[in-house]
């Protein structure tokens, strides 16, 4: 009789403990995702991924501290590094920049020239550079103006360099080439997408993409067949509103794993001049755009100038449950 009562008490204690552990586990799960994936932009080749990740996290911590919050060390943070893979593709394809055509006599790549011209024209209109300013750079050249005329494209880039108030012509050229290779060459996209996809699990994950990284993350999230759970996709300085880039992903679609998509940009960031709205990136549900970032970096596009924005830090902190 005594043993029977003791067994029942032990069983009740065990059940109570199990229920309590379940409640605790649910509470922990409800506090927010335990994973954070950070996807960097272009121009990161031959850099130390550990140091890059540390720079991102230090800036995130500063942003959280402004809100009186702390980014806990227990969060599992992934930083998929594709900088060297992209650099190999750049060297393998050897797509000449228009400045290379001028200085080295490189062969023109018509497909890239059209892509670059469309990007440059988008940047020109968005930054307020006038036709007269471009004409001044083109000078007395009698060749017909158009996307297949590399001299005309160079004139637009020089005008952007002088009057655009943001990125240099060299940076715009390199950006256009890198995005061109990623969006138009299947092997390049597949390799880079796989690097980022390898950092994802089916655990709830906040995902942050900057510049080209926001394009890569979008590509992965819309094509991955796993049961991913992304309560927040945060894009910073995202160029998906540029038609030449957007058209590479038609038909456009909202990534199924994403619960909320928050797109933050500086209106003087030449790469991200267009919000991801109905006019520039029509998807359902609509993307929430935030245009009040005052990016403190020289070209208004740097990641540090985005991550320390109070509203960006707020959304990220809320999603992480901190």
What are these regions (language model features)?
Residues 24, 191, 282-283:
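Intrinsically disordered, low-complexity linker/propeptide segments enriched in Ser/Thr/Gly/Pro
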Residues 1-6, 23-36:
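C-terminal segment of N-terminal export signals and the immediately downstream linker at the start
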Residues 61-72:
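Signal peptide-proximal N-terminal region
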Residues 43, 77, 82-86, 91, ...:
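Lipolytic serine-hydrolase domain surface
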Residues 34-62, 164-271:
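Serine-dependent carboxylesterase/thioesterase catalytic core
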Residues 1-19:
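N-terminal secretory signal peptides and thylakoid transit peptides that target proteins
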Residues 42-47, 55-58, 73-202:
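Active-site catalytic motif of lipid deacylating hydrolases and related acyltransferases
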